Amino acid sequence: SLDPKIASTLEPRAPTPERRLTAVRRLADAGIPVNVSIAPVIPAITDHEIERLVARAAEAGAQRVFFLPVRLPWEVAPLFRAWLDAHFPDRAGKVMATIQSLRGGRDNDAGFFTRMQGQGPWADLIRTRIAIACRKHDINRERVPLRRDLFRPPRGPQGELF
């Protein structure tokens, strides 16, 4: 979210939206290809910002944008419902109904091809909005080729974690 209040409610200790966009700009200015993840897209809470998020990511120098609709695996679902009731009680029912519509009527869909993108009309709408916004801002045109020539093998044996 670009809204500092929503962003801090979702991720209280994470960098602000502006700091994240500054990081995108600095990486892009240094010649590093940058992808931006718009996640989680939460119906009736963050989905209204999609076009603006794509525009700001493009302005900051991102080459690609992708999205992930909110996922509620296992223990996350009751935590999310409690968070929703605490912060957005006026929309909790609508949010959960929409999430379930893109997850086959359930809070979660662990299917390999559907868990990260969702399915159904709402997921299709978000995909279409992302695609239109990306065309408008001239991003997601092509993938950056992998530069294996930039890889430097370590000088010695790999270190140990423990």
Question: What are the functions of these language-model segments?
Answer:
Residues S1-V24, P33-S37, R64-L68:
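Core AdoMet radical
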Residues V24-L27, A57:
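Generic structural signal for hydrophobic
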Residues H48-F162:
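Auxiliary Fe-S-binding modules of radical SAM enzymes
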